């Protein structure tokens, strides 16, 4: 049995038994990792707080060769993004980000770029408009996946130029791209279409965003 350590983002957790949970992580070094966290439901669980969605953690896990589920040994919080610090709109987008990452991340694959992108967007969400960050996030996920088409084939020349420029910026600079509300909406429709086409389904959280915002 090999033991691994990596920075990670907690993506999702769901019950496995009365006291255990299966947890999905995006790790910096090993891609998507699914593992069992034992004793999570106990009052003094060592995992307290670290399994909340999109928590930045230092993860230690072990796994036998050819075993699908790892065993989560330790999960230390580096940075949390608790729901009470954000509006309901931001929290809804966070749920969307989690679902995107579950779908696009791959197991046993280096995910340095995807991890850095995700963490930067989460950190910027404390200061910048969440809808603009969501577009930046979607565009880069599609690009990293290799399924982002030439923008001038999908957008007007002016908007394609703006979006190309935005993607060259650091996430903290996205507002300087100068996208109008109408342009953001057009970009949202395009990203939603591209994600849905690639995954061959519409994400549940995308439906909620469309209905509520």
Language-model features, listed with the residues they occupy:
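Non-catalytic alpha-helical scaffolds and adjoining flexible linkers that form interface surfaces
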Residues: 1-21, 26-213
